[in-house]
Design a protein with these regions (language model features):
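Hydrophobic transmembrane alpha-helices and their immediate loop junctions
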Residues: 1-353
Length: 353
C-alpha cells in the first residue's frame, strides 16, 4: 500500500481491488460520517482516491422559487393558448372554462416533470447520493414558439457508487415520467372529442388545426384505443401533454453526455466506446433525416431531433461521462437495460404517411 498526498485529495495505491460490497460500505460510511467522497480508479495498481466533499449550493438552486413560479406562469400561458383554440373549435369557449382547463393542463404537465425528477431523487436518497432539487425551468410559452418549460432538473453532487446504481439513477426518471404521462394520456384520449370529416377538412384548410405529422408508438397505441368512424380525433390539451412528454423522453434517452440515456449506456460501456456513441448519434439522426426528407419528404422530425442532439452533445457530451465512483465495479442492471430499450422503442418519433 502506498499513500500519495496531493493536498486537495489523497491517493492510496492498493495491491488489489476492494470488492464491490466492501467498497459500497466504505463509500457510504465515509460520505455520511466524514463528508469524504471515495473513488476507486482503474489502473495497473488500483487506486483509492479520497476527495473532501464541499457543501456548495448550485447557483440555479438558489433561485428555485422564482424559477418555479415563472414556470407555472409560462406553462399556464401555453395551456391557455392551447385550450382557448381547442374550445373555440368545438364552440365551447368561455373565460371560466378556458381558465379551468388551462389550470388542468398546467397541473398535468408539471406532474409529469416532477414525477420524472422524483424518480431520480428516489434512487439518490436510497443510495445516499447527495442531490438537491427538483427545480423547474421556465421557457417561452407557445405564443412565442415553445412549450413554456425546459423541464426540471436535480443537481447530483456525488457520483453513484456502482454501475448498477448509475443505471438505476438514469432509468428511473424517464420511467416514472413515462408512466405518469401514459396515465394522463389515457385520460386525454377519452376526453378528446371527435369532429366530422368535413369540419376537420375545413379547419385544416383554414389553418385552425393541423394533421399530426409524426407520432410515437406509445402515442399511436393510446389514440387507437378510441375507435373513430367518419371523423377525426381532436387532441385535447391533456392528451397533448403525453404527446410532448414522449418526444422529450426519447431525446433524453439518447446516449449523450449526462442525459439520462447517457447514464444508462455509460453503466455498461467503457469511456471511449461511450464517447464514440455520443458523437455518432447526432450524425446518424441528421443523416437519416436528410435521406428521408430528400426521398420521401418525411424527415423533418429526425432533422429536428438531430439538431437537438447536436446541441446537447456540444453542451454535455464533449467531455464524456465520469461513470460510477467505483471504476473497478462490474455490476450491471439487466432490468434497466431492458426498460431502456423498451422506452426508446415506445417513444421514438415515427413519421405518419
Amino acid at each position: 500500500m502506498e499513500y500519495r498526498d496531493y493536498g486537495v485529495f489523497l491517493d492510496i495505491v492498493l495491491d488489489r481491488e476492494i470488492n464491490p460490497e466492501k467498497f459500497n460500505e466504505l463509500y457510504k460510511e465515509l460520505l455520511v460520517n466524514y463528508r469524504v467522497i471515495m473513488l476507486q480508479l482503474k489502473a495497473q495498481s488500483p487506486i483509492i482516491r479520497l476527495v473532501p466533499y464541499v457543501e456548495k449550493q448550485h447557483v440555479i438552486y438558489k433561485y428555485r422559487w422564482a424559477l418555479t413560479a415563472t414556470t407555472f406562469i409560462t406553462v399556464f400561458l401555453t395551456g391557455y393558448g392551447l385550450t382557448s383554440s381547442f374550445l373555440s373549435l368545438i364552440s365551447q369557449a368561455n373565460t371560466t372554462r378556458i381558465i379551468a382547463e388551462s389550470i388542468l393542463y398546467t397541473a398535468t404537465f408539471l406532474l409529469t416533470l416532477l414525477a420524472h425528477e422524483l424518480g431520480h431523487l428516489f434512487i439518490s436518497r436510497r443510495e445516499l447520493i447527495e442531490a438537491e432539487g427538483p427545480v423547474l425551468l421556465p421557457a417561452p410559452p407557445i405564443q412565442l414558439g415553445f412549450i413554456g418549460t425546459f423541464g426540471a432538473v436535480i443537481f447530483t453532487k456525488t457520483p453513484p457508487p456502482t454501475k448498477k446504481t448509475l443505471a438505476e439513477l438514469g432509468i428511473m426518471g424517464p420511467l416514472m415520467g413515462f408512466i405518469v404521462a401514459t396515465i394522463i394520456g389515457l385520460i386525454g384520449v377519452f376526453i378528446s372529442p371527435t369532429i366530422p370529416l368535413d369540419v376537420a377538412d375545413k379547419a385544416m384548410a383554414s389553418g385552425e388545426i393541423q394533421q399530426v405529422d409524426f407520432s410515437s408508438l406509445m402515442f399511436y397505441l393510446l389514440v387507437n384505443m378510441r375507435r373513430v368512424v367518419n371523423g377525426k380525433l381532436l387532441i385535447h390539451p391533456v392528451l397533448f401533454v403525453a404527446y410532448v412528454v414522449y418526444i422529450v423522453t426519447f431525446i433524453n434517452l439518447l446516449p449523450i453526455g449526462q442525459l439520462d440515456g447517457g447514464h444508462v449506456v455509460r453503466s455498461f460501456t467503457r469511456g471511449k466506446t461511450f464517447n464514440a456513441m455520443g458523437l455518432a448519434v447526432p450524425v446518424l439522426l441528421l443523416s437519416l433525416g436528410f435521406i428521408l426528407e430528400v426521398f420521401y419528404g418525411i424527415g423533418d422530425i429526425y432533422i429536428g431531433v438531430g439538431i437537438a442532439s447536436t446541441i446537447l452533445y456540444l453542451l454535455t457530451g464533449r467531455h464524456g461521462h465520469p461513470g460510477s465512483a467505483n471504476q473497478c465495479d462490474e455490476s450491471h442492471c439487466s432490468w434497466c437495460i431492458v426498460l431502456y430499450i423498451l422506452l426508446l422503442v415506445l417513444t421514438a418519433p415515427i413519421p405518419i404517411v
